[in-house]
From Swiss-Prot:
UniProt GO BP: translation
Entry protein name: Small ribosomal subunit protein uS15
Protein's organism: Pectobacterium atrosepticum (strain SCRI 1043 / ATCC BAA-672) (Erwinia carotovora subsp. atroseptica)
HAMAP family: Ribosomal_uS15_B
Gene Ontology cellular component list: cytosolic small ribosomal subunit
Record carries keyword Iron: no
Taxonomic placement: Bacteria, Pseudomonadati, Pseudomonadota, Gammaproteobacteria, Enterobacterales
Length: 89
């Protein structure tokens, strides 16, 4: 299930550099995190939904790649983002 348009707009406004900045690394990671958190609730109820689990693993992998890229390019933005999102690193 995807996020609503309002939820995406709020994430873009919170993490983007401008109002229409939907492509920056921070926004992409924040959107993926929101979708991952939504799917985790889905899997607590639907344990055998392996098709969606594959999509979840793909999103987690994509988020990891984006975070690695951001860490390589700008460590300050990386640490700020993981602190704001509450990720472990």
């Amino acid at each position: 299930m995807s996020l609503s348009v309002e939820a995406k707009a709020k994430i873009v406004a919170d993490f983007g550099r401008g109002t229409n900045d939907s492509g920056s690394t921070e926004v992409q990671v924040a959107l993926l995190t929101a979708q991952i958190n939504h799917l985790q609730g889905h899997f607590s109820e639907h344990k055998k939904d392996h098709h969606s689990r594959r999509g979840l693993l793909r999103m987690v992998s994509q988020r990891r790649k984006l975070l690695d890229y951001l860490k390589r390019k700008d460590v300050a933005r990386y640490t700020s983002l993981i602190a704001r999102l509450g990720l472990r690193r």
